[in-house]
């Protein structure tokens, strides 16, 4: 057992607390969406922007978080992240309209974007390199508990209090965390290169405008010509960034990353793959409540097997990849996830509710194997000089693709659910059935990309749990 000095242990607890807050918030909201819709006078089929606004903001802000921490100091930025996250939570709870809630989620997302990467950077600075793995294991555990606790806790709060409490519980916790950060966390700074502000703005504008163009006609009533202009503007911003990065050695993300074939394939596959899988955590609790009439608490409990399956698969995924190779694992898990998603809908509509936890457990296992394989494939062949930049770009793409996935899911629900639908009605079942069929196709398509992954040339190392010190 690795022993840390008392002051270091307290600092690690602060980082772990930030990981927990951020991971809890990513899952606790989904269960509450139907109740939020009823309270705000909105259709539950149009509540996806509550999720998209948060995840997209995280994607936009991630590239700036590490630079800000180096320039201004890890304590100052981590403190600011907790304060912004807590203020965003307060404004979410006070929101009286969907637009107010979306804006509050943007503020919350700014704080959430800085918590995890700055937390990792803090750990690197406060512990010796030899203890880094043990320290990261220590701080990451609460982050794994958050997704497990979030759906059930969200269901309890919604059912026995109100949806406002899923945000209000962050306030006292955030105040304590901010005070502890300010008093106990050292403020490490280092000399940094100039921040690529033009590149950051081009990427931010491109991501935000393209996501808005996907859903603007349904949620905001934007005309088709305006949407076409937005899509063209977003694409132009991304193309301008590529031109900027080609001419600028200090660009936010170097184009030299794409000289590594597995990085290019892995990044493209991760983007396409997470669009499909990003729909599932949003759609599943909404379907359980609106489509099947489950209570918020019951729907939250049903999400736990999916998280347990995901956590359990992480223990054996390296051995599976070593045995079968990246290409076979990624193609099989991609097609398997599409089939399992269809199995979930079939079992639900047949009324075999007792099988749903087993199907969701299987879904979590398959999804986790695919996620872990995509991540390691993308980064494993990068040279050390580009590893940090590649990891940051992958993190941004992961968040962006999930926001696009939720946006597309909301767009599909709006397209198939034009008429008023009731809870657990035949019309509602048809809306979700057609949506799930489209989702299964979207989930399966990245198999075409993963089929191009080259044969593996080296084995992945398996860490022995008997020899690892914590």
UniProtKB/Swiss-Prot annotation:
Any one GO MF annotation of this record: transmembrane transporter activity
Location in or out of the cell: Cell inner membrane
SUPFAM superfamilies: MFS general substrate transporter
Membrane topology: Multi-pass membrane protein
Keyword Cell membrane: yes
Pfam family for this entry, one: MFS_1
Swiss-Prot/TrEMBL keywords: Cell inner membrane, Cell membrane, Membrane, Transmembrane, Transmembrane helix, Transport
TM region positions: 12-32, 49-69, 77-97, 102-124, 138-158, 165-185, 197-217, 225-245, 263-283, 286-306, 342-362, 396-416, 431-451
Positions in the Cytoplasmic compartment: 33-48, 98-101, 159-164, 218-224, 284-285, 363-395, 452-470
Gene Ontology CC: plasma membrane
Superkingdom of this protein's organism: Bacteria
Periplasmic side: 1-11, 70-76, 125-137, 186-196, 246-262, 307-341, 417-430
Family: Belongs to the major facilitator superfamily. TCR/Tet family.
Protein name: Putative multidrug resistance protein MdtD
Originating organism: Salmonella typhi
Lineage: Bacteria, Pseudomonadati, Pseudomonadota, Gammaproteobacteria, Enterobacterales
């Amino acid at each position: 057992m690795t022993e840390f000095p008392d002051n270091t242990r307290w600092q690690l607890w602060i980082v772990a607390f930030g990981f927990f807050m951020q991971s809890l918030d990513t899952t606790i909201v989904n269960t509450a969406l139907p109740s939020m819709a009823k309270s705000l006078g909105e259709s539950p089929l149009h509540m996806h922007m509550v999720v998209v606004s948060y995840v997209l903001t995280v994607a936009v802000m991630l590239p700036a978080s590490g630079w800000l921490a180096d320039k201004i100091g890890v304590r100052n930025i981590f403190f600011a992240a907790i304060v912004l996250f807590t203020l965003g939570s307060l404004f979410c709870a006070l929101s009286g309209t969907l637009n107010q809630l979306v804006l509050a989620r943007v503020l919350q997302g700014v704080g959430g974007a800085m918590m995890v990467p700055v937390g990792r950077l803090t750990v690197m600075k406060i512990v010796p390199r030899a203890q880094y793995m043990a320290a990261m294991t220590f701080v990451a555990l609460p982050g794994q508990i958050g997704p497990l606790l979030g759906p059930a806790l969200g269901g309890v709060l919604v059912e026995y209090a109100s949806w406002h409490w899923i945000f209000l519980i962050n306030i006292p916790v955030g105040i304590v965390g901010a005070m502890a950060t300010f008093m106990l966390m050292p403020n490490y700074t280092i000399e940094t290169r100039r921040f690529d502000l033009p590149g950051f703005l081009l990427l931010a504008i491109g991501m935000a405008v393209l996501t808005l163009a996907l859903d603007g006609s349904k949620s905001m009533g934007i005309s088709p010509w305006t949407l076409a202009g937005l899509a063209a503007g977003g694409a132009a911003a991304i193309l301008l960034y590529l031109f900027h990065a080609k001419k600028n050695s200090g660009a936010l993300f170097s184009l030299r990353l794409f000289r590594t074939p597995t990085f290019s394939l892995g990044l493209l596959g991760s983007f396409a793959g997470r669009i499909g899988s990003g729909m599932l955590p949003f759609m599943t609790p909404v379907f359980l409540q609106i489509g099947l009439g489950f209570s918020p608490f019951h729907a939250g409990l049903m999400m736990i097997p999916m998280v347990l399956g995901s956590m359990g698969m992480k223990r054996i995924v390296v051995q599976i990849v070593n045995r079968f190779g990246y290409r076979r694992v990624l193609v099989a898990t991609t097609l398997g996830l599409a089939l399992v998603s269809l199995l979930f809908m079939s079992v639900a509509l047949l009324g075999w509710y007792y099988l749903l936890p087993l199907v969701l457990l299987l879904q979590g296992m398959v999804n986790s194997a695919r996620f872990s394989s995509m991540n390691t494939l993308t980064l494993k062949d990068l040279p050390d000089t580009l590893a940090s930049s590649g990891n940051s770009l992958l993190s941004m793409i992961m968040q962006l693709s999930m926001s696009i996935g939720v946006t597309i899911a909301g767009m599909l629900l709006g397209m198939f659910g034009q008429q008023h639908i009731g809870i657990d009605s035949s019309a509602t079942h048809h809306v979700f059935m057609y949506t799930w069929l489209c989702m299964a196709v979207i989930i399966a398509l990245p198999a075409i990309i993963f089929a191009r992954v080259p044969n593996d040339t080296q084995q992945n190392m398996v860490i022995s749990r008997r020899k690892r010190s914590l």
